[in-house]
């Protein structure tokens, strides 16, 4: 599958990089996490150039990977890299804005198997700094969840922070800050039975499921999305 993408002048201007018909820029897809419930598959990632991340991507399939749709609008200058579904209906995707530095971490939440999503910021309006990226995300129930935020790129003296949510990701509060890396207690790795793997020969991301000691491929997504060629203004 090739995720459709057409570069616009607004994309180039907002990201602050140069692409023209004379010097086009290659555009790539990166997929970082995957999970599934029954025949419903989900993957997340971003669309980027060599220089900058352009958009987040959230893809879903309702037929075991045979066909795919984008199930959330792309978020400009952002990426998604965490994904969890607790049951067939309840799920979360975590990410952040990535330009010019990782900032404004957020969680997307759904209660209807990905048909609708709500975007909720992790940092409160009173947070003195907006920089940070989600390093870990886990929900132990439909209500209780946590994220670890790394704020080191923003120059924070105590860069690691634990935020918890008591209402399924609708709101978040700061619980701990530390100069040393923090980890969510009892949180497993991202779905150990599903993964995205780069196949260099095929230039594709493969969605794979663990079955015993083997990995079975269910879908392939092209890394290359074409060239960004923005004509000069007239």
Question: Where do the protein language model's features map onto the residues?
Answer:
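Extracellular glycan-interacting surfaces
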Residues: 1-234
């Amino acid at each position: 599958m090739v995720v459709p993408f057409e570069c616009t002048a607004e994309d180039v201007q907002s990201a602050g990089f140069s692409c023209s018909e004379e010097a086009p820029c290659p555009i790539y897809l990166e997929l970082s996490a995957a999970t599934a419930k029954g025949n419903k598959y989900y993957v997340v990632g971003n669309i980027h150039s060599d220089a900058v991340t352009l958009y987040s991507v959230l893809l879903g399939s309702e037929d075991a990977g045979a066909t795919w749709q984008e199930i959330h609008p792309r978020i400009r200058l952002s990426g998604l890299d965490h994904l969890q579904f607790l049951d067939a209906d309840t799920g979360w995707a975590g990410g952040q804005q990535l330009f010019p530095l990782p900032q404004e971490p957020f969680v997307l939440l759904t209660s209807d198997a990905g048909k609708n999503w709500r975007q909720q910021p992790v940092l409160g309006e009173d947070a003195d700094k907006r920089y940070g990226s989600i390093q870990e995300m886990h929900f132990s129930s439909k209500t209780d969840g946590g994220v670890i935020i790394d704020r080191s790129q923003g120059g924070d003296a105590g860069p690691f922070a634990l935020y918890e949510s008591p209402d399924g990701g609708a709101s978040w509060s700061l619980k701990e800050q530390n100069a040393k890396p923090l980890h969510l207690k009892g949180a497993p790795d991202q779905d150990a039975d599903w993964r995205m793997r780069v196949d260099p020969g095929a230039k594709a991301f493969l969605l794979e499921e663990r079955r015993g000691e083997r990995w079975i491929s269910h879908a392939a997504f092209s890394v290359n999305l074409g060239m960004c060629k923005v004509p000069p203004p007239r």
